[in-house]
Swiss-Prot record:
GO BP field: arginine catabolic process to ornithine; arginine deiminase pathway
Matching HAMAP family: Arg_deiminase
Gene3D superfamilies linked: Arginine deiminase (1.10.3930.10), L-arginine/glycine Amidinotransferase, Chain A (3.75.10.10)
Primary location group: cytoplasm
Keyword Hydrolase: yes
Alphabetized InterPro entries for the sequence: Arg_deiminase
EC number, as in UniProt: 3.5.3.6
Species the sequence originates in: Listeria monocytogenes serovar 1/2a (strain ATCC BAA-679 / EGD-e)
Pathway: Amino-acid degradation; L-arginine degradation via ADI pathway; carbamoyl phosphate from L-arginine: step 1/2
Listed name of the protein: Arginine deiminase
Catalytic reactions on record: L-arginine + H2O = L-citrulline + NH4(+)
Amino acid sequence: MKMEQALNITSEIGKLQTVLVKRPGSELENITPEYLESLLFDDIPYLKMMQKEHDFFAKTMRDSNIEVLYLEKLAAEALREANNKESFLTKMIKESNQMDESALYVRDYLMSFDEEEMIRKLMSGLKKSEIPERKKKHLNEMMDEQYPFFLDPLPNLYFTRDPAAVIGNGVTINRMFQPARRRESIFIELILKHHPRFSNQDIPVWSGRGEPFSLEGGDELVLNEETVLVGVSERTDARAVERLAESLFNRSPKIKRVLAVEIPETRSFMHLDTVFTMVNFAQFTIHPAIQNQQGELNIYILEKSENGLEITPRRDFQRVIAEVLDEPEIDFIPCGGEDVIVSAREQWNDGANTLAIAPGEVITYDRNQVSNDLLRSAGIKVHEVISSELSRGRGGPRCMTMPLVRENLK
């Protein structure tokens, strides 16, 4: 561990020290055309190439002296430490909507595996064909025999950004918007509670997965140690943002304000980080289509007051960002430039979804050449990673990482 604290994120751009990722696995090979939509994919990736691309991405980070941790490895280690596979399985199976005898049948089958194989099967999905045939006793079992899974695969797990997010020395363990992703944050909960790297750290949970409203990490940006920017999007509910703000104001000694920015509720703009990311002290990449021609959009400043929350509506997005960062001006670098066709194409392929690994230094997909050239022209050091298969899941370098530790900015 490189710092005393297991978690420390006080900006989007501080030197990245430790990051959590998930290498794409057999869960991607359980996607079929019939279930693309429900599993939140537009196409079926080629796993072998996807893994090569992800390995190159991880190597790019390691080459910059970033410690890369793997979700699947930490989850298995945490499960071994917890010494209670049955309780963990019961929770996972219950949230997979398996009940009655089928739940017991699935649990007994999975209990026969060691921790590594159990975690792998829970992530990849459990096909009905894997378990020996048994007599069906109930109507729902007989009517549902065409559906191939006892437990659905979790192909979005390689987007580790969304199930949880570190803010300061604490974390949000998120209630995901889509049912296909709800179980993902159970693995984060397991790791933080039982893995020896985290279990003795008394880590505050600012927002838990039992919350009634959805919140996802792709909408959570830590601008500085006093300010969190949260997108109200297709995946994050305004009520979740308000509850998060109240929790932070009551329990975090440093957070002074939460900014809520409203973005269109569309799949292409599913999270704030698909249209807006921080790349340097006063520089951001932005998809121009989220603002009107005057550069305006709805942004709300939430601050603590004597009567609870004080909410101030604003429209001048760029000015608000400059004010909270105490910068005279902010440079917005347009994803894809000024050409609306190029901008739309490169945003779709995550041209705005940069991962800052240090101030003025980012990782991007190689396919977004116009956006990458614009970043370089603005003085940003760009590391390009191969992306033909990774991009099929509709997420970029920021989406594929959960930063755990960054250096504090001086």
